[in-house]
Amino acid sequence: NSWENNKNIIFSGSLIWVFLLIIVGFLNYLVV
């Protein structure tokens, strides 16, 4: 059960990083 919780935390964390990368890339696209 703890492994399932850790997997969910890692998955949600990676989703947040992907979202941040998309925002940064979009801002760079707007600036350029």
Curated annotation (Swiss-Prot):
Bilayer topology annotation: Single-pass membrane protein
Superkingdom in the source lineage: Eukaryota
Alphabetized Pfam families for the sequence: Ycf9 (PF01737)
Subcellular location(s) per record: Plastid, Chloroplast thylakoid membrane
Keyword Iron (UniProt): no
Transmembrane segments: 9-29
Record keywords: Chloroplast, Membrane, Photosynthesis, Photosystem II, Plastid, Reaction center, Thylakoid, Transmembrane, Transmembrane helix
Coiled-coil annotated residue ranges, if any: none
GO biological process: photosynthesis; photosystem II stabilization
Gene3D superfamilies: Photosystem II PsbZ, reaction centre
Keyword Cell membrane annotated: no
Gene Ontology cellular-component terms listed: chloroplast thylakoid membrane; photosystem II reaction center
Recorded family membership: Belongs to the PsbZ family.
Summary of subunit composition and partner proteins: PSII is composed of 1 copy each of membrane proteins PsbA, PsbB, PsbC, PsbD, PsbE, PsbF, PsbH, PsbI, PsbJ, PsbK, PsbL, PsbM, PsbT, PsbY, PsbZ, Psb30/Ycf12, at least 3 peripheral proteins of the oxygen-evolving complex and a large number of cofactors. It forms dimeric complexes.
Role according to the record: May control the interaction of photosystem II (PSII) cores with the light-harvesting antenna, regulates electron flow through the 2 photosystem reaction centers. PSII is a light-driven water plastoquinone oxidoreductase, using light energy to abstract electrons from H(2)O, generating a proton gradient subsequently used for ATP formation.
Protein name, per record: Photosystem II reaction center protein Z
Organism of this sequence: Euglena myxocylindracea
